């Protein structure tokens, strides 16, 4: 199983996916711990941080073991999460001139989501291209 992870780590697509996951994790954790988005109790902070870590770890672990045709769906799910949540919660505040604290990292979080959506499209096109490519003689 780890051989698949090592093999995928050589591809730029997996590296981009991992970097975007790290950006998303860092923003979500910063929102949780610094800006207290999930409440002020220690239990709420620890719980939210563990869920953030779990969200990133599941994506990083699943990507290499999924079939090439299914990977775009995983990447699109993470990208849509980042793009939509980041846009609604942070980018609108930046555009309105009301940005504070986590809105700046939230904008980077949104850009990571946009990168993942573009990566999902690229992976889907590659999967379709491989599917329709004629067999070599």
What spans do the regions from the language model cover?
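Hydrophobic transmembrane helix segments
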Residues: 15-46
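Cytosolic juxtamembrane helix and N-cap/initiation of the first transmembrane helix
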Residues: 1-21
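Hydrophobic alpha-helical transmembrane segments
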Residues: 50-59, 63, 116-117
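Membrane-helix boundary connector in multi-pass membrane proteins
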Residues: 68, 72-73, 85-106
């Amino acid at each position: 199983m780890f051989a698949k992870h090592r093999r995928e780590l050589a591809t730029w697509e997996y590296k981009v996916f991992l970097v975007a996951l790290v950006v998303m994790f860092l923003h979500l954790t910063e929102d949780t711990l610094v800006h207290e988005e999930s409440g002020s109790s220690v239990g709420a902070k620890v719980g939210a941080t563990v869920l953030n870590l779990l969200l990133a770890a599941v994506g990083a672990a699943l990507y290499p073991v999924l079939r090439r045709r299914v990977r775009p769906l995983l990447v699109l799910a993470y990208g849509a999460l980042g793009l939509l949540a980041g846009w609604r919660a942070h980018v609108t505040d930046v555009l309105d001139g009301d940005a504070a604290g986590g809105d700046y990292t939230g904008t980077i979080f949104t850009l990571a989501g946009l990168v993942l959506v573009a990566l999902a499209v690229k992976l889907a096109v590659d999967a379709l291209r491989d599917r329709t490519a004629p067999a070599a003689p």
